[in-house]
Amino acid sequence: MDKKIKRVAMVGAGLVGVSVLYSCMNRGLAEQYGIIDINDKLSVGHSLDFEDASAANNHNFSVGKIEYSDLKDYDVVVITAGRPQKPGETRLEMVADNAKIMSNIAKNIKKSGFKGVSIVVANPVDVMTFIYQHETGFDKNRVISSGTSLDSARLRFEISKKLKVHPKSVQAFVLGEHGDSSVSVYSAATVSGKSFNEIVKERGISKKELEDMHTTVYKKAYEIINRKGSTYFGIGSTVAELVEAILTDSHAIFGVGVYLTGQYGVKDLYIGVPTVLGSKGVVEVINFNLTKEEQEKFVSSATILKGNIQKALEAIKG
């Protein structure tokens, strides 16, 4: 097969998986897309629907159901498969069920001879990424999670709304768990190059207002799930950005889950931090000088994730 053709595979044909694929297709990121799902009927159905969409798309691509053995020719595999989050349920309450699913997926992908970059999206995302890397033994830099990329986008939106500016004028990151223990790093945020903290002082934005913004960020998923059952458009667009950074070797910076070896004072786990992404996955972890409060919250988030990693490891042993 022609290795110059860019190929993206999706494991999991649920709402998140197909939203990621559709975002990738509309961005013209690859020439070939493959879908793997335990439900063959669903994979074929989506493939046929995407064929119709391709006829009205400005980008040329093919899409179809594939097998795990086909992954050896793919550049990126995105893994969204897992049971969905229920209304009122935290992501961490899904650990045992999704760890077993992820373990099986990882073994199949390893067997395929896949050599590209893996992006794990299934929740709880950094715990599942640890299990995936543990089971595949893949280079840790070639395995990432969607991490806090969506959380960071939500924070940028909240800051932009507060200041009445376009979200693209805001650079801000959420670190830690993709969930309730995440940390909005206001100390490193900028708006058109100006320190957000300076703007906070100038405009008299209170600490409570900042706390409320963070609460809105981490609770937004629950708001969406309670109203429509699941989130998929936001994460679909966000993950497509990660795929684009990998396929184009852009070296863009995202808040993704990467394996830390001492950065930010933690190690031996996947957790959301600002990261430079390229064709081989992780290029560099960007170190922010966190405030004492931010650092303490980040370490606390890491501790929570480590506890859940142990639960996941126990689940796949059983």
Curated annotation (Swiss-Prot):
Catalytic EC class: oxidoreductase
Key word Transmembrane present: no
Keyword Chloroplast part of the UniProt annotation: no
PROSITE patterns: L_LDH
A biological-process GO annotation: glycolytic process
Phosphotyrosine found at: 222
GO CC annotations, alphabetized: cytoplasm
Compartments, as annotated in UniProt: Cytoplasm
Pathway entry: Fermentation; pyruvate fermentation to lactate; (S)-lactate from pyruvate: step 1/1
Catalytic residues in the record: 178
Protein keywords: Cytoplasm, NAD, Oxidoreductase, Phosphoprotein
Pfam families assigned to the protein according to its UniProt record, in alphabetical order: Ldh_1_C, Ldh_1_N
Enzyme Commission (EC) number: 1.1.1.27
Subunit field text: Homotetramer.
Family membership: Belongs to the LDH/MDH superfamily. LDH family.
NCBIfam families registered for this protein in UniProt: L-LDH-NAD (TIGR01771), PRK00066.1 (NF000824)
Function: Catalyzes the conversion of lactate to pyruvate.
Name of the molecule in the record: L-lactate dehydrogenase
